[in-house]
Amino acid sequence: MGEMASLRSHKNGIIFILDIVLFFVLLNVLPFEPKANSGLALLAFIAVLWLSEALHVTITALLVPLLAVALGLVSTKQALVGFADPTIFLFFGGFSLATALHIQKLDKLIANKIMALARGNLFIAVIYLFLITAFLSMWMSNTATAAMMLPLAMGILSQLDREKDHNTYVFVLLGIAYSASIGGMGTLVGSPPNAIVASNLNLTFSDWLWYGLPIMIILLPLMIGILYIIFKPKLHLNFEQTFENIEMNPMRILTFIIFPVIALTWIFSGKINPFISGLLGLQKNIASFDSIVALLAAIVICSTGVASWKQIQSNTDWGVLMLFGGGLTLSAVLKDSGASKILADSIVFMIDGQHFYLIGLLVAAFIIFLTEFTSNTASAALLVPIFISIAQSLGMPEIGLALIIGIGASCAFMLPVATPPNAIVFGSGQVKQSEMVKVGFLLNLVCVVVIATMGYMFWLK
């Protein structure tokens, strides 16, 4: 392991040095205005680091404002304003809610209660397992959901013969990983790429539901169907149910009240915001209302003792929030320097005149297979602003390509390293990489077609 770490460190060092060389070469040889040259050189430097992960993606995100200021592209205040974007606080509220569910064991309680409805029928239990995983991933991190659901699944599968029923094991375990990824598409707080798209296009929580939820509802049964066709699991069996006994107490009841109230306020913010603004005597609706609700959620959760600040702190992925900030700063710098227009015009030159559906297919295939090897959050942070500019240059609705990038970034099903849920189920030792690649490649292709088709029919018009 030490030798592998040393090799990786050596490789990352070489990539970093070459990236610095590339940065200075581009800064001095690009034929555009000095400001645009600086923006493009910065983009190339950050892109190499984000895609190669030669530096941790969060550290790379923190380099964005530092270099933007050093290059004279923005002031310090402008460089850091992205780190206080309302979407960051909305996502923080999502982390707070997820912490409350986890600390009070309501995630397990929900899973156990619904699984009990299967009454020992394996087929029904497996379908419930996938649906619960997808639902919880809409509100919790995909990683935490997959990690929580894996022991529940293994408890059921332990009653089967590992050799004889190997395909059933693979069907269930891959189904959990993929359900977690697909479920994360459903809400704005479900997955970081969703929030990156929303922050670039000023989408609210309820706006996102119109885009993410239909894709989730379409992909979930398609995923289950593909897994079933390929692995032909034996699901006609019965099993004995043994679940952890989690009793209701005042704190759990309070959490059960807080969670739906906050979720429904986000969903119906379009109606609730004017009502509350009127009650407060405000002339206009509260701006970034979803983020204000998210802050209220964190305050209520802490002040009622449902979860402590330390627990929220340790369950919040601060690196992801910093990555949001770096991505938003990069987006603003590219736009202000003219770099995004130059880049967009170059790509438009190659694809101008092509059918919008073909463009959607190409973009979906590009992002889905790219995120098999790169961080989906970093890829979205890098590409969403660029593809918004490309859409504008092509005369397409800017939301179309941005949504294809944002949702496609969550569709990495082929490799264990592609997403944490994939890695978690692969780590069980019951799934071979060849099995994941086989079904994942097919599922990736289905996602390309579904996302491009939905994009063409509803987002690119």
UniProtKB/Swiss-Prot annotation:
UniProt keyword terms in alphabetical order: Cell membrane, Membrane, Transmembrane, Transmembrane helix, Transport
UniProt keyword DNA repair, yes or no: no
Molecular-function annotations in GO: succinate transmembrane transporter activity; transmembrane transporter activity
InterPro entries: Na/sul_symport_CS, SLC13A/DASS
UniProt source species: Haemophilus influenzae (strain ATCC 51907 / DSM 11121 / KW20 / Rd)
GO cellular component: plasma membrane
Compartmental location: Cell membrane
Chain ranges passing through the membrane: 13-33, 54-74, 81-101, 120-140, 170-190, 211-231, 256-276, 286-306, 314-334, 349-369, 377-397, 399-419, 439-459
Name this protein carries in UniProt: Uncharacterized transporter HI_0608
Topology within the bilayer: Multi-pass membrane protein
